[in-house]
Amino acid sequence: MQKSDKSQPNQSSTSNQSNPIGVFDSGSGGLTVLHALQATLPTHDFLYFGDHQHAPYGEKTGPEVYEMTRQAVQFLFDQGCNLVILACNTASAIALRKLQQEWLPSYAPGKRILGVLVPMVETITDRPWIKWEQHPQQYLQGTVGIFATKATVRSKTFLVEIKKRAPQLDVIQQACPDLVPALEAKKDTATTDSLVEGYVRQLVEKNNKVPNWIMLGCTHYPLLKDAFEKAAAKIIGNIMGQGVPILCQPSICADSLKDYLKRHPELTTETTRSQGKTTYFTSGNSAHVESATDIFCPGIKSSEASSSKWQQIE
């Protein structure tokens, strides 16, 4: 990969040539976040990179996740992005902080990397990320149930960051190793519903408690929100006698980014076109990736997400 341009971001707010926002995921799940970003920021351009060749990250070691994420971010910076969103919980949990603190200051100090974990933690704790020490949430009580990949659960990042901000909250987690492969393989609804029900049951039985909130800690899982709602109603509703709110990342992260860009307008520019454009990159087989696009981001027009639009990189 070529060395990134370290020049300062374009300071203008509107241009025919915008600084695109980079969105990265280990595979296709990040398309759910991209779709929400496109709807919330319609006049911005986006570059999406899916590292399908190395997916899923949930089964990788920490050093492997860090290095693959670093290379992906570097690629998006080299394409002209000043801001990259890690639309991957595993990458956000394992690689983001090290990238921000150790790599970014020397490689591209004028650029920024954000993750999808922070907005979720802020939402569940009702505390800004940077001000929790002054004003921890002392009164919020209950149990948060988090469903995520093995690597995200193993990192304990959600657990640690939530407990910092809301020490009275209990946090219980459940790894769901079969959900991403099932979605990528387009398994039928009966299969995915059964898998989800099994994981919800495991969470409750293993911890001997039921969650007051469910957090879907993988960008693939919004596609299974209905399945989680049904499983929660069946297993948890029978115990609590009420429904359980389910927090999904796409809309929460999109609203958070919109607010962030109001405070940091120098990082990207809106195009003067009525609609921004999106360019798609993959490290995998472009034809195979195209076939999965319709389930992960149904709002994308087929012509926009066709195989000719997915650019395969080495």
Q: PLM features: what roles do these ranges have?
A:
Residues 1-314:
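Non-catalytic structural scaffold of enzyme domains
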